[in-house]
Amino acid sequence: LEGESFCIAGPDTEGSNTTAIITSFCPKLPKTKPSNLRLKVLLDCSGSMAGDSMKQARVALKHLFKQLNEEDSFAYTRFGSSIDRVTKKMTMAYSERIQTLLSTIDKTEADLGGTELGMAMTDVFNMNANGKARNSPELTDSADVLLITDGDVWNIENILASARISGHRVYTIGVGSAPAESLLRELAKDTGGSCEFVTPREDMRSAVDRMLTRMRSPQAVRFAIKWHATEEKHKNHEWASTLPPQLIDGETVHLFARLPAKTEKPPVLICKTLVKEVEQEVSSAKPTSITWDNEGIVARLCAAAQIGELTECKADTKLAQSLAMKYQLVTQHTNLFLLHERAE
């Protein structure tokens, strides 16, 4: 089943003749020559990273730096309540430098106090990248930032505002059992990066590989989806989850939608790229059939996904609460009371 796309749908009994649908796409994208990197690595070395989180980070960093080639440039910064620029500025990834850096990774400890992320992000953004931006002949200070952290932080709005105007794409990996999930997702989303989370003791190297593949992607692939509602007058969906800003070849994306009419054809994910300012379709993916569910589970899962997006974007909290009540879901907007009646 590897590389296959799937689709499950069912009636939304809470709606008016609507259909809830969940689909998983695994598009095959054309092979392209990878771009060189300008990468700023930012590692959380606050006290909360001690133990398994730091062990995961050491393994991941060694793996990451070994993937760099001599055409790449990079910087490596540790932070906590203070900032430690391991490399004082952006530098080319020559083999001698990488070997010297690798020899220091095992000595990396969670010894820098609290989690002053805002200060560290500002310092990294201000570091001269000294190169040309992707698809641009102009010199720029922008680069990709890879942030590895486990801690919750304060001053979130200022951090997000700084990231948005920095010109950097921020990629985030949250480690441990309680990372600052909403902030890490927003940092990635608002800057065109991506976000992943790894559980305690999970191997982080796969997440690093996916991040590097995205960073090296030389062209932006745009995505569109055809939901195939049966009735012509109901071509548009009532609601659908947001398409990801970027996919890599072989990666699976899960999407949810609520259609105003029944669908008999599986949805199709269309991948396009911009060639000389003209969009050209380069790939598509679709399930071979639709599996039908009549228990109402699909509708509730779609509602949960919609609530998740509303909550993440801090959008319509009243709508999120209304959906949670309507579909009887336990969320941060609702409460569940369990009453146990004892026998007399």
Where do the language-model regions lie?
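Von Willebrand factor A/integrin I-like adhesion domains
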Residues: 162, 178-218, 222, 327, ...
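Ordered, soluble secondary-structure elements with a strong preference for glycine-centered loop motifs
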Residues: 50-55, 314
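Short Asp/Glu-rich motifs
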Residues: 84-88, 182, 207, 343
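Glycine-centered, small-residue-biased loops immediately flanking beta-strands
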Residues: 72
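An acidic, Ser/Thr-enriched
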Residues: 1-42, 64, 202, 221-344
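A generic structural motif
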Residues: 75, 173-175, 198-201, 208, ...
